[in-house]
Swiss-Prot record:
Organism: Staphylococcus aureus (strain bovine RF122 / ET3-1)
Active site: E172
Protein name as catalogued: Type II NADH:quinone oxidoreductase
Reaction catalysis annotation: a quinone + NADH + H(+) = a quinol + NAD(+)
Keywords: Cell membrane, FAD, Flavoprotein, Membrane, NAD, Oxidoreductase
Top-level taxon of the source organism: Bacteria
Length: 402
């Protein structure tokens, strides 16, 4: 019987990959399949909490937990390794720790920051990308305040922070900054009036997924807490001094001691090397989340460009979508093992909430707009639910937001 076991290989332990595996281990027996999960790190991190760790309002260690803590070791083989090559036809995946065969492959390799070729952005701006970059950024911000307080010749630029991007991540990071800055000013005896936070956005509107009313709430709340917005202002370069922006056709230098890029992500760069038709690390999938020509390969999460039937544009890359895709793929793998046909993925939009620090927010929940403390509470519910969905009640108590 063991010789008939299928090899199920899952690449990536982010929201999509880990949701797939934790669902599979509940529904598939060891006689049916051998499940292997490969991830670069020994830990999973809550990517939707990185803005908190980056600002320093949440310890970076609270954002992560060991992958193996949510796995059934008798059901899943966990390998800490970096994937270097995917050979679709040979059904092999190469890593820095060896080669792994598969009958069914799930690609959930996650995201990396996308700077869209802006000169100097990768070299001179912090990225909100993973727990390592989050820790570096939060420490850098605090170091700037400490150095300013200790310096005899003070440079106000040390207290200036530039944030590129007024989308979801950028705005949530701004909210956390407005919570963190008063703490740092109190700790180091810094006049808060000297702190300058500027958000630069190329698009004509921030938070494009929300109504004008919700956007106005977010802008008013953040402006009241010291944030200045420069909307419809493209960043053309980044240097050691800050951002270079374009205003009315002319370039202007914005100076700051800290520059942060929060305006774009893309799927894993391994995608272009492994598949055709990949754009920004994402490949268009079929309705069951497999790819053309390979019914045994699923692509989900940030690497997937899933276009719902009848639609023209792919769904955005969100944790909510990634986790629903993981559940769908787990069910379809079970169906494949049973000799049944796969089912189409159907996304259920339960809503989206953008936090503005720990006490405010804006969002749409089941089609209804919410703002203020209600939105902040709902955000904590969403964050805790995500942990519960993967690790159960125990992990929710340990890592949840309540």
């Amino acid at each position: 019987m063991a010789q008939d076991r299928k090899k199920v290989l899952v690449l990536g332990a982010g929201y999509a990959g880990l949701q797939t595996v934790t669902k599979l281990q509940k529904t598939i027996s060891t006689e049916e399949a051998e499940i292997t999960l490969i991830n670069k790190n020994e830990y999973h991190y809550e990517a939707t909490w990185l803005h908190e760790a980056s600002a320093g309002t949440l310890n970076y260690e609270d954002v992560l937990y060991p992958v193996e803590s949510v796995l059934k070791k008798d059901k899943v083989n966990f390998v800490q390794a970096e994937v270097t090559k995917i050979d679709r036809d040979a059904k092999k995946v190469e890593t820095n720790q060896g080669i792994y065969d598969f009958d069914i492959l799930v690609v959930a390799l996650g995201f990396v920051s996308e700077t869209f070729g802006i000169e100097g952005m990768k070299d001179h701006a912090f990225q909100i990308e993973n727990v390592i970059t989050a820790r570096e950024l939060s420490r850098h911000i605090e170091d700037k305040f400490a150095n300013y307080a200790a310096s005899k010749e003070k440079d106000d630029n040390d207290l200036s922070i530039l944030v590129g991007g007024a989308g979801f991540t950028g705005v949530e990071f701004l909210g956390e900054l407005t919570d963190r800055i008063p703490e740092l000013c109190s700790k180091y005896g810094v006049d808060q009036n000297k702190v300058k936070i500027t958000c630069v956005e190329a698009a004509p509107k921030m938070l494009p997924m929300f109504s004008e009313e919700l956007v106005n709430h977010a802008v008013s709340y953040l402006e009241d807490r010291g944030v200045e917005f420069k909307i419809a202002t493209p960043i053309v370069a980044c240097n050691e001094k800050g951002f270079v922006v374009e205003v009315d056709g002319e370039k202007q230098q914005l100076n700051a001691g800290t520059s942060v890029w929060a305006a774009g992500v893309r799927g894993s760069k391994l995608m272009e090397e492994s598949f055709e038709g990949v754009k920004r690390g994402r490949i268009v999938t079929k309705q069951d989340l497999t790819i053309n020509g390979y019914d045994n390969i699923f692509v989900i999460g940030d690497c997937s460009a899933f276009i719902p039937a009848g639609e023209e544009r792919p769904l955005p890359t969100t944790a909510q979508i990634a986790m629903q895709q993981g559940e769908s793929v787990a069910k379809n793998i079970k169906r494949i093992l049973n000799g049944e046909s796969t089912e189409e993925f159907e996304y259920v939009d339960r809503g989206t909430v953008c936090s503005l620090g720990s006490h405010d927010g804006v969002g749409m929940v089941f089609g209804k707009p919410i703002a203020g403390k209600k939105a902040a509470f709902m955000k904590k519910v969403i964050d805790t639910r995500a942990v519960f969905k993967i690790g159960g009640i125990g992990l929710a108590f340990k890592k949840g937001k309540f």
